[in-house]
Amino acid sequence: MNSGILLIDKPIGYSSNQVLQKVKKKLSLKKVGHFGTLDPFADGLLILGIGKGTKLSNIFLNEDKAYVAEIFLGEEKDTDDLEGDTTFKSSQTVSYENVISALKNFEGQIDQVPPTYSALKHNGKPLYDYAREGNPITKPARKVIIHELKVIEFKFPKLMLEITCSKGTYIRAIARDLGRKLGIGGHLQSLRRLKQGSFDISDSK
């Protein structure tokens, strides 16, 4: 394949760039790019553009995405995911009804503050670099759209959601903000991307 699109089911433990480099080497490709990063702890659909296919990045990066997310309630972490240090812990429990009520605050267009550990840039430098140096920077809230939030399973402290959202949405931030809305903290425990635009994980290799 000299040009086109390749759909990968990214495994846990690899960065998006590591997967890209492995594919590039295995298929002896010169030009490869990915259309939407997945954190190393996350798995699921990763779209790669090959050759002239890399020019389609603007189209794919603007597409809606769907995920299955597992949120751990009762503990907040500095990275907003399972890999960070605990910053807040609560012994309080919440009911299914509490969760459903809180989730209503995350439907439709919302203002979302990006995680301080993210690849967003500040003066040309990724936010995660500032955070690791002990100088976290909080970016202004951005408008994102949550098209659907569906509870798959709830067994405290774990909540499994299916989320369909617009570009630029941080699922880690939803976990963080839901935990805060419930007053007990929360962080993202696992994440799997199911869809991006018209492409589905079932079409991947």
Residue ranges and their predicted role:
Residues 1-205:
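Catalytic/RNA-binding core of pseudouridine synthases
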